[in-house]
Amino acid sequence: NIGAFIATLLCAYIGEEYGWRFGFGLAGLGMIIGLITFLTGVKWLGNLGSPPNSDKLSKNLFLFISVEKSIYFFGFMLVILVWYLIQMSGELGIFLIGIGTITISWIIWYCIKECSKNERNRILVMLFLIACSVLFWALFEQAASSLTLFTDRNVMMGSWFSAGMFQALNPFFIIILAPVFASIWFFTSKKGIEPSTPKKFSLALIQVGLGFAVLVLGSNFAGPDGKVAVIFLVMMYLLHTTG
């Protein structure tokens, strides 16, 4: 999150001031530095992150192609498929609806036919939480699109602070509040009053909704030019991040 905070400020500033090819170039340079840092320090990780059964990866899956190489190959083919689907937005919607319907139908059928009552209930709860998670992230990730456009068009900013730089608020709040939330969950867990996972999901959705409600409130205080004070945007990001 320190990297996300610094990178968002730098890349957005460079992109706005000198051109987005430089902004994206700086982002690419940062990722290369991050990869080099990881590869340099991987020797200190020991077996952490290693596959539990590494011998299985070396076994041949097709002719002389190992399981590991097959994973790389099919991963690359999926990149091509996803790229194609993105170009064909209409077909993408049909594809996602079809895959989603088939997947959910199979899971429900499997729950009814193969699972015990306890297992079935847990899987159905998991499906509900997945749906809540999809809703949360669909709203949260508006930060990179509609909320940035809203910031650019409808928020009073300083002379050098661009709309893209507001993306740094999320990692900033994470850095500042991570110790606070860690202490809260440690304390509540120790006392036996920590909220359950479904309750945490509910709180997250409520806070995302409150974040957008803050923008609605801010619109009531908009000036003649339709712009709102930056404090409303900051409060929205705070609510979304803590959610």
Where are these regions (language model features)?
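Membrane-embedded alpha-helical bundles of multi-pass transporters/translocases
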Residues: N1-G15, L26-A27, M31-G34, V125-L139, ...
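Intracellular loop-helix junctions on the cytosolic face of multi-pass helical membrane proteins
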Residues: A12-S159, F181, W185-I193
